[in-house]
Amino acid sequence: MLTVWLTPHSNLLNEVVVFAENPRMIVEKAINKIPLNYSDKRDMLTGFYRETVQKGRRYIGISEAVLDVSKTAYTNRNINYDKVRVEKGRRLLSQKASDTLAVKVVGGPNLGVTLDVVKNKGALLDFEELNNYEFWMAESMLIDNRMQYVINFRPKVILMYALLYGKLYIDRERLSFTRIEMSLDMQNATTAILYKKPLGLRFKPQELSYLVTYKDVDGKTYLNYIRNTIRFKCDWKRKLFSTSYTVASEMVVTDRKEGVLENIPNKEAFSLNQIFYDKVDEY
């Protein structure tokens, strides 16, 4: 008589992920919920700002500041009345006269206004602008223990101005934007990046990328962190080799006061055409 012993054994099959949701529809629903999910009051944010300039791997400029950022409610998504004030500033590393090219950031501290993609609908999240892009689902992921839709996007048309590609992270339950990663299409990037340059200098853009994150606090979602990175190469006519530069600007929100009626006076606001590196000694 033959006796056979059988031992139970569980064998987990590979997971099959099926995306039944329409990514464009999810983005549109999240846009419609912005007035509900984000602040409906005027807030005053405190932020730490830093901008750095690298020539190759060497830092040639580092400047820092403490900022006040006055933001109106997200209900109308209008940034015209949002302002930035530099409270304190310092230059940790100055560019030298021996550097053949001075690289400076125009309007840098205004990151908290212009690159708040959820508030500034002109940046990406506008229903008409969405028509310029195609969207597709990526694998979901957790951020702060909350499940997120991850939606890729890229241009589907060619326009006179540069478009973007990247990822949108949207909270599955609340349909709030929690993280936005974007890069500029390099085909028409020079106009978007370059403010002015010396005669005879050839400018070759390599990268313009953005990272914006938001944080949920007591049922509302608030701006948390912004980073802007620009990489480019420059060479002079009749020169054999080019030089690479990396310019990074970032702001992290360190404090927030809700329902603040005070606005930043125009004379104290940092304007979009000012250069923080040149003005840092005034603070």
Tell me what each language-model feature is.
Residues L6-P8:
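Interdomain boundary/hinge segments at the C-termini of tandem beta-sandwich modules
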Residues L125-N131, M137-M147, T178-M251:
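Acidic, serine/threonine-rich low-complexity disordered tracts
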Residues R50-T52, R154-K156, Y169, S183-D185, ...:
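Outer-membrane beta-barrel pore domains and translocons
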